Amino acid sequence: MRANCSSSSACPANSSEEELPVGLEVHGNLELVFTVVSTVMMGLLMFSLGCSVEIRKLWSHIRRPWGIAVGLLCQFGLMPFTAYLLAISFSLKPVQAIAVLIMGCCPGGTISNIFTFWVDGDMDLSISMTTCSTVAALGMMPLCIYLYTWSWSLQQNLTIPYQNIGITLVCLTIPVAFGVYVNYRWPKQSKIILKIGAVVGGVLLLVVAVAGVVLAKGSWNSDITLLTISFIFPLIGHVTGFLLALFTHQSWQRCRTISLETGAQNIQMCITMLQLSFTAEHLVQMLSFPLAYGLFQLIDGFLIVAAYQTYKRRLKNKHGKKNSGCTEVCHTRKSTSSRETNAFLEVNEEGAITPGPPGPMDCHRALEPVGHITSCE
């Protein structure tokens, strides 16, 4: 597609033979590491997370796609609009504004699936949203970029990475399909695979984050504005996604899922599109943003998970104390009731085995209750 590029720093034509400057000499290593590790991570994660998907629930989301519709509205409605507002509000340079907008137009990433699992979200909805947003990106990415850049005076060919989108779909759907099959055939074993996959996925996320920071240290620039946007952008996505899901009367489980899906973007797709569309000279100014965004969305995700697990643990301890107190009271009351019941039965037995016809006093004594039988509700 065609977008416009402005100002005195007009974007020159792409040059595949141009050598990268020192600031981006990690280009080859970074691309190789992120491609290989991300592909392996995606395959392992989606297979293990696919073991948590039930065909019945997945089909219900497809038949009544209200949650998916809300998620797509957040993904291709709120995120591109937020990116546009941030680019305008911070008065970014043209190439930097394009980088922010491309990030906002990208589909959701698989990182949201592992975070959704850790916050007890709706895994069926999470995987459905990731798949549907990736498919929708084939048309929504060029449409959103065109709508938000038609008034900008930039002159640059933006290449939509359709091949990358296709690879993402393959790496997403095939492992999930195998995971769903394993969960259908061997439900007990799938629970073990799911737990192992969650741990391995967390470790791989940390490895990718550290590797990205270390390998791309030469590409970080000192533009505090881009770093600020990369910090607040995923937070805005999480908050607005949660509020929109809450406004549309989704369950708390779905609200957490949609929130994480909205703020987590496909970083690899954004980097690929920038590399295909811009020269090395402009990548120096642009590549730091998706890398910083990826780092901050990891940090935000871990903070959300930590906050949820802390809240969950405190709530569990609170209910545990209440239950233990009730158990003690119930045990005491049951012990007292048992003794009173035995005494009551002993009195009746004495009255029952007394020979001869019962007199008035005997009848009164036999019918007189000795204690009150209580129960704990």
Curated annotation (Swiss-Prot):
A biological-process GO annotation: sodium-dependent organic anion transport
Cytoplasmic face residues: 51-67, 119-133, 181-195, 248-266, 312-377
Glycan attachment points: N4, N157
Cellular location(s): Membrane
GO MF entry, a single one: sodium-dependent organic anion transmembrane transporter activity
Highest taxon listed in the record's lineage: Eukaryota
InterPro entries named in the record: BilAc:Na_symport/Acr3 (IPR002657), Bilac:Na_transpt (IPR004710), Na+/solute_symporter_sf (IPR038770)
Membership in a protein family: Belongs to the bile acid:sodium symporter (BASS) (TC 2.A.28) family.
Protein name: Sodium-dependent organic anion transporter
